[in-house]
Each structure stands twice: as structure tokens, then as C-alpha cells.
Amino acid sequence: CAVNESQVYKLADTTSFEEGAMTEPVACCLHGLDMCNITPASTVLVIGGGMIGLLMVQLAKLAGAHEIILSEPVAVKREMGLKMGATLTVDPINDNIPALLADKGIHRINTVIECAGLPATIKQAISLAGNKSVVMMFGLTKPDDEVAIKPFEIFQKEIEIKASFINPYTQQRALDLINSKKIDVSSMVCDICSLDKLADILSKPELRNKGKYIINPWQ
């Protein structure tokens, strides 16, 4: 098929097609991160340790965040988060997160990046956000989901609630990061599978929990 040249981006000789396939999600994350006001002194909480959450951990590190906390219930994803640059991981099901953070000397979160897309985790993001913080609603909710919030809490803490939609003008920057190996997209891909394995992967949570799959229809 023919594609407009403005939509074509060149992979480096050292970048595989599998790595190149990750450019779009990295670009989306970059757009969201640009809106988060992260500075070298920032403490960042990422909620959700799937592929998007792990990309956000890496990008927050590249942005210079001082502390990067990953909240994720699956142990293997927490371990991956530490490898990707998180300074601390927490289990939202079994940990008392405010008490754990206080015990670690973390008393204010400047940026919360919500990557799970659940009403419960959006409420949690607002609850854990510090004074004058940014809450980035990045995770995709269902269209008819509703979230009960306490407006006074947002008012009292002067929270900015933001949302990010797709990837305007960040595709080339994302590919530059991948080409330069400044961001690791390969470690998050657990397997490259043929099309006939797709139904099995989608139907089994234990397979999906292993990480991100790339489907190669010609394999």
C-alpha cells in the first residue's frame, strides 16, 4: 500500500522491526509525560505496571525524576519496574501505600500517572497526589465509567487533573529514543507469536500477565 511520506519514519540499522512496532505507544506516553511537569526534584507515582506503565517509568527517569514509585499487584511486573528505573515498588492489594511511603521518607508525590484505567485507581491517584501535584489520567477507561471524587480534596491540595490523547507530534522523538537505545522496549515483549496463537493469549490471563506479545502474522 502507499503511505504519505510524512507518515513514514526511518528505523536505525540497529533497530529491529519488533522494536519499531513499539514507536506508537512510546509516542503516546511521551505526549502524556510532556504534560506532567516533571523536574529533577520530582517524586513520581506510576499506577499500573503493564507495558504503558513500564514505559512511563523509563520516561520519568529520563525526565530526571528523583523518586519513581510503581504501584502494581503482579510481582513479576514489579520486578520489571525496578529493572526499568523505579526506585520503589508497592503492591496496591497488600500494602498500606501511605504508611509504606511515609516509612521510606516519601511525604509528597508531585506527579501521579494513572495507567490502569480503572475508576478505583483514578480515585487512588487523586488520594495519593500531594499538594500542587499533577494527576495524569493516562489509562483508558470504559466510555461509560464514572468516578466518584471529592471536589474539596482537589481544591484543598490544588491538584491539576490532566488527560492525554494519542500522540500528536511525538512520533519522531519516540523513534529517536528507541533508535538510540535510551529506552528499552525489548524487555517488555515476552514473546513474538503467530496469528493462530492470538485467541489463546487473549483468553488466558496467566499468559497476558507475562507481558506484551507481538503478533507476527507471517510467522
Enumerate the language-model features and the residues they cover.
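Mid-domain Rossmann-like dinucleotide-binding core that forms the NAD(H)/NADP(H) cofactor-binding site
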Residues: 15-94
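Glycine-rich cofactor phosphate-binding loops and adjacent beta1-alpha1 units
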Residues: 36, 79, 83-158
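Conserved beta-strand positions in the Rossmann-like core of class I SAM-dependent methyltransferases
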Residues: 68-69, 136, 162
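C-terminal hydrophobic helical "lid"/dimerization subdomain
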Residues: 123-127, 168-219
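Glycine-rich phosphate/adenylate-binding loop and adjacent beta-alpha elements
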Residues: 1-8
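Residues in the short beta-alpha loop(s) of Rossmann-like NAD(P)-binding domains
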Residues: 73-74, 141, 167
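A general structural signal for well-ordered alpha-helical segments in protein cores
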Residues: 8, 26-29, 53, 122, ...
